[in-house]
Amino acid sequence: MRIVYDDVRDLKNIVETLTKFIDEGLFEIGQDGIRLVAVDKAHVSLINIELYKELFKEYEVEDEFKFGFNSQYLAKILSIAKRKEEISIESDSPERVKITLGGALNRVFIINNIQVSPPEVPEVNLEFEVKASLSSKAFKTTINEISAVTDTVDIIAVEDKVILKGEGKEGSQIENEFSKDTGAISDMEFKNEAKSPYDVNYLSDILSLTNLSDYTRLAFSTEKPLELEFNMEGGGKVTYLLAPKLS
């Protein structure tokens, strides 16, 4: 098994996010691509990572390979990499994985392939009243601003707008409006007005994923799970599901 990706930044952002979810993860590397599913310890959120083989500079996988890793340790390795450096992941045995970071200086890491069981995740079929592609930069800024005043964000949709609103102590409030007119929404599908509260801390934990794409695909309904999708240029996506914060 040998795969090469020509810009390690995307993997850094993904693994950095995983450290907020899990201690150990499992990349299932198949002939068509790489997949990982993780559920946070409180079972409030779920992340599904799909990296298609077309995304990679080289992709040589004859038989399925399961790569179990400690998320904090892998994140430390990737943190060494510089911008746009190449990363290769390869193995000729089920016990060891070789990671090479290529730049002005090649750095080689041999790590143990640990035993990790994939989580049991029930099949979820959700229907959404609202779907919209929001500017990732604006979404990240908004979540950071709201998290400074409260731990709950209300997501509201009315016709051609999506509003993110937070109310803090002593009447403090922040409200950011996304619309096509301002360029903060690229496209939107609207069936009915919707409003739902979510834990802003869980959204803060995944903000590194906004670096994967210019737009974040948001989908939700009133008091139903929120779905965020980050589509990577070249072939891959990360999907995040978050349960509503209901009293």
UniProtKB/Swiss-Prot annotation:
<comment type="subunit">
    <text>Homotrimer. The subunits circularize to form a toroid; DNA passes through its center. Replication factor C (RFC) is required to load the toroid on the DNA.</text>
</comment>
<keyword id="KW-0238">DNA-binding</keyword>
<protein>
    <recommendedName>
        <fullName>DNA polymerase sliding clamp 1</fullName>
    </recommendedName>
</protein>
<dbReference type="InterPro" id="IPR022649">
    <property type="entry name" value="Pr_cel_nuc_antig_C"/>
</dbReference>
<dbReference type="InterPro" id="IPR022648">
    <property type="entry name" value="Pr_cel_nuc_antig_N"/>
</dbReference>
<dbReference type="GO" id="GO:0030337">
    <property type="term" value="F:DNA polymerase processivity factor activity"/>
</dbReference>
<dbReference type="GO" id="GO:0006272">
    <property type="term" value="P:leading strand elongation"/>
</dbReference>
<comment type="similarity">
    <text>Belongs to the PCNA family.</text>
</comment>
<dbReference type="Pfam" id="PF02747">
    <property type="entry name" value="PCNA_C"/>
</dbReference>
<dbReference type="InterPro" id="IPR000730">
    <property type="entry name" value="Pr_cel_nuc_antig"/>
</dbReference>
<dbReference type="Pfam" id="PF00705">
    <property type="entry name" value="PCNA_N"/>
</dbReference>
<dbReference type="GO" id="GO:0003677">
    <property type="term" value="F:DNA binding"/>
</dbReference>
<dbReference type="InterPro" id="IPR022659">
    <property type="entry name" value="Pr_cel_nuc_antig_CS"/>
</dbReference>
<dbReference type="GO" id="GO:0006275">
    <property type="term" value="P:regulation of DNA replication"/>
</dbReference>
<dbReference type="InterPro" id="IPR046938">
    <property type="entry name" value="DNA_clamp_sf"/>
</dbReference>
<keyword id="KW-0235">DNA replication</keyword>
<comment type="function">
    <text>Sliding clamp subunit that acts as a moving platform for DNA processing. Responsible for tethering the catalytic subunit of DNA polymerase and other proteins to DNA during high-speed replication.</text>
</comment>
